Amino acid sequence: MNREIMLIFGTAGVPISAEDEFKAVDVLRKLNLGAMELEFVKGVYMKEDYAKKLKEYGEDIIFSAHAPHYINLNANEEEKVENSIRRIIKTAKVLNNCGKNLVFHPGYYLKRSKEVTYNRIKSNIQRILDKLEALNLNVMLRPETTGKTTQFGDIDETLKLCFELNILPCIDFSHIYARSRGVINDYNSFYKILEKVENVLGKEAIKDMHIHLSGIEYGKGGERRHLPLNESNFNYRDVLKALKDFDASGTVICESPMLEYDAVLLMKCYNEL
């Protein structure tokens, strides 16, 4: 399997048919999936030793991590900002033992302007980067494109942030679709997103992508909830076609409630293109 020139598919968290992370590795191998995102969305439950052993057992699996959802680097209360930074650092300490890509939602606008929010979030991510360097933690922070219009993280501000901080994004195409309330849902629109990534961050960013895909339901304010791929109008096939035509490589994490079943569906669909 040449990982340099292709997309590796995997699950957001432990597959449905596995009891824990070690059994998850067995399930992923059996299904020819090659990645798993450790879901710390409700808190960083994993110890560093466990992560090290997990990587030894799953040496062929690409592990990433999703930091807790209780993060707002634009919070009004300084204590909430400090707690958010701590949660990302805690995620990084665990991930450093088994993987590289650390996905997080940077925060909410609250009542601030986009510009003020951007500057506050940028400055707090810089603080995190300084701490990661001081602790010698070799992880890549990946701010995610977000699905709700109240959340910081449209495609343009995410790419600008990554360019200015020399980090890389997590491109969640389902969120982009939901945030646009279904407007961004065809091959040309998805291809244009990849062109934006390349224009802002260079070809290297296309060769080292971290992507989230899932069926999704949206309302007036964007994302409502994740759905199985085939229970949503999200046009995942055109996303895969755009990725293939653009010669993108990296990892694709399936966040559908059907986890490994939909991850296999994505992989098969991509391989048949």
Curated annotation (Swiss-Prot):
CDD domains: AP2Ec. It holds the Pfam family AP_endonuc_2. It comes from the Archaea. GO terms for biological process: base-excision repair. GO terms for molecular function: DNA binding; DNA-(apurinic or apyrimidinic site) endonuclease activity; phosphoric diester hydrolase activity; zinc ion binding. This is Uncharacterized protein MJ0133. It comes from Methanocaldococcus jannaschii (strain ATCC 43067 / DSM 2661 / JAL-1 / JCM 10045 / NBRC 100440) (Methanococcus jannaschii). The lineage of its organism: Archaea, Methanobacteriati, Methanobacteriota, Methanomada group, Methanococci.
